[in-house]
A protein has these predicted regions:
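Residues embedded in well-ordered regular secondary structure
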Residues: 1-68, 105-108, 136-152, 164-170, ...
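A surface-exposed, glycine/aromatic-enriched loop/edge motif typical of exported proteins
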Residues: 1-7, 97-151, 208-210, 216-219
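Transmembrane beta-barrel wall of Gram-negative outer-membrane proteins
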Residues: 29-104, 115, 122, 176-180
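Small-side-chain secondary-structure face that scaffolds active or pore-lining regions
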Residues: 65-75, 95-108, 168-177, 182-220
Length: 220
């Protein structure tokens, strides 16, 4: 059994004028890929009389299972102890954390970015998603499997999943600065006096790039 697909009605598509066979074609594995993580660690330490220090840095980059998604993690640590005088001890500790998530996978029923939800609940099992990887027409509009009509080939309900993956960008950036300092003084009779300072500075940034041609963001 052959049937006319939205792509066969699209003059800009390689499938124009080519009916498709009515068969199961909705393979959600076509939407995803294997994620890869690359981690680098560097550390340095030095210890001599009345002084020791250590510096470490870790950088981790991970590609997500969704196209156009990734994550970055960076950790910096610095710790040192020294005795400026025989009766004084100084300790300094600093930690920095950077975390960025780009297009992290989302769940829930929001109808705007959860591609998996749209295509498991509302997808048509005869749609071959691989045919829609070339989602953009020369004029910038998107091809989709649920058009309004023959003369109006814009999305009626759901956007092309590949368009959502590549045209929508959502970034969250977290930064933490944690530091502490100790100064202690040796007193007679095995007593000690000192002061300790602690600090914690945090930062958060959210960025969203929403495509203007998306039906899913018209009311958002």
């Amino acid at each position: 059994v052959k049937y006319v697909t939205p792509l066969s009605l699209d003059e800009t598509s390689d499938y124009y004028g080519k009916p498709a066979t009515w068969q199961h074609g909705l393979d959600l594995r076509d939407l995803y890929r294997t994620g890869v993580t690359n981690t680098t660690n560097v550390s340095f330490s030095k210890s001599v009389k009345d002084f020791n220090t250590r510096v470490s840095f870790t950088n981790s980059y991970r590609t997500g299972v969704q196209p156009n998604s990734d994550a970055i993690r960076r950790f910096l640590g610095f710790k040192t102890n020294f005795k400026p005088t025989p009766w004084m001890n100084v300790s300094l500790d600093y930690k920095y954390t950077y975390r960025q998530d780009h297009n992290a996978a989302e769940s829930g029923y929001n109808g705007s970015r959860t591609v998996l939800q749209e295509y498991t609940q509302w997808g048509q099992t005869n749609v071959n998603l691989k045919d829609y990887k070339d989602y953009k027409r020369p004029d910038g509009s998107w091809r989709t499997w649920n058009i309004n009509s023959v003369n109006n080939q814009s999305a009626a309900f759901h956007d092309n999943p590949y368009a959502l993956f590549h045209e929508y960008n959502h970034r969250t950036i977290y930064q933490w600065n944690v530091f502490s300092g100790d100064v202690s003084v040796d007193l007679p009779y095995n007593l000690k006096a000192g002061v300790r300072v602690n600090g914690n500075i945090r930062g958060y940034k959210l960025e969203r790039e929403r495509p203007s041609g998306s039906i899913n963001f018209r009311s958002n």
